[in-house]
């Protein structure tokens, strides 16, 4: 009995396989016999049976044109064309070949595009409820308080949108990093320029100070030389006058005793006049040296003391004679 049951099951299995093979072979033959035009028409019929509605005369759905998906599917009130354009028509700027013009324009466009995408993401995030409410009012055919709630189909995340966001975020970070590097380079250049300018000013100040010191030192040496020369001239003049006075005194001593007293008085008067004259000349010479020569105060005091001692010595010698 068991063998009979097994044989019956095996026969049924073989008959099923034969039947399925006979069904598949005509289908394959039919597919092979179909021409490419029939295949295109069949695909067109399948595309027309898509959940995205085709609404002639309406504005095309931008989300569908961009991503090939629409979150509202059959409830969307925009048109969903059966054939999406592969490339959108874009006008080429005439300045695109000029690098100096094209790069700033591209930067501005990229920033505006980033802001636009951010606004779209914000609108999608915060405007879904209002949009669903508007769609429900238009297609429910009822009042707002009695309209049916429309829940959108499952939202598939487009990987291209994620890649676009990641690319814009990377470009933004690169732009920030580039701006930071440029700011650091500008700061370093400014510091270098400030350092060079400071060194130049310090060099000029040092040069001016050195020139002033050299000028003061030169004036001091000239004053010392002038003072020494004046001392030498005064010494020679004093020796000459002393020699003349000694000669006159010797002559007076050699004169006979019968000379009258008037001659001696005249001689003393002449000596007094000569002493006063020498004193006046020494005072004038001192006044001339004082404003013209710039030398330390110690040297000036020493010169005054020497002149005073010289005048006093002349007075003593004159009165002794």
Swiss-Prot record:
Pfam families to which the protein is assigned, alphabetical: zf-CCCH
Biased composition (Basic and acidic residues): 10-29, 181-224, 231-244
Region Disordered, residue ranges: 1-59, 181-269
Mapped zinc finger ranges (C3H1-type): 55-83
Coiled coil (UniProt feature): 164-290
Superkingdom of the organism of origin: Eukaryota
GO molecular function term, any single one: zinc ion binding
PROSITE patterns: ZF_C3H1
Record keyword DNA-binding present: yes
The keyword DNA-binding is annotated on this UniProt entry: yes
Keywords of the record: Coiled coil, DNA-binding, Metal-binding, Zinc, Zinc-finger
Signal sequence extent: none
Name under which the protein is recorded: Putative zinc finger CCCH domain-containing protein 9
Species this chain originates from: Arabidopsis thaliana
